[in-house]
Amino acid sequence: MILVKRIRIPGLETEKPRRLYVCLPKNYEKSDRRYPVLYLFDGHNVFYDSHAAYGKSWGMKEYLQKAKLPLIVVAVECNPEGFRRLFEYSPWDFSAPRPIGRVEGLGKVTMDWFTTVLKPEIDANYRTLPDRAHTMIAGSSMGGLMSLYAAVEYNHVFSRAAALSPVLWISPSKMKELIRSHRLADPTRIYIDVGTAETDLRYAAPAAVFETAKALSKAGADVSANIIPGAAHNEAAWEKRIPDFMKYLFDDMIRA
């Protein structure tokens, strides 16, 4: 069952309210069980092709129906206006190629809202396991960058993260310093990957993925770094990796 609400995020206003998706596991209403929660960026691209920016979603709805995982999935739509998604999903200011220009990094505003407003609301209204051990976050491209940022800077909230094709060319020195300055709690589990057929490998070059994975491991995380042969930088490619990253993030919870 997927519930869709319209919300506004203070400091990240849009002309129209954005969608918040909450996917509840099968038989949620027939039990009193509590569930882990996975938070996802780019919520419009997660469940429905009809909502997706380019007409193709991750197909997460179909995956969850087939996998029957005991999990709540919460996905938040980004700001679709102009280039505002880049602002919301960058932790740092940076200069982008024309016609974008200078980007003001509002990633901290985004994650402060996730952790101090959204998560408490989800925990209050649904039967979650609210502790760090059962709270995860994932995203692709700029959402992958934000997932890494969240896993490190908000490590007290998120114990697991998946970053699919993360945009690592944005302020690489700041990402290195962010990771270097943190000692990550045990457990911290992070999945990171990149495809070999991405349109522009600046966005997630294999070397940058392995360098980031090495730094995360040194900071205390268990890391799975993956190069995906023939995979492009799009939702169809990321959909195929859902079983892999979900198993890595979630498998021990199922077996526990």
Language-model region placement:
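Non-catalytic cap/lid and distal C-terminal segments of serine-dependent acyl enzymes
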Residues: 1-256
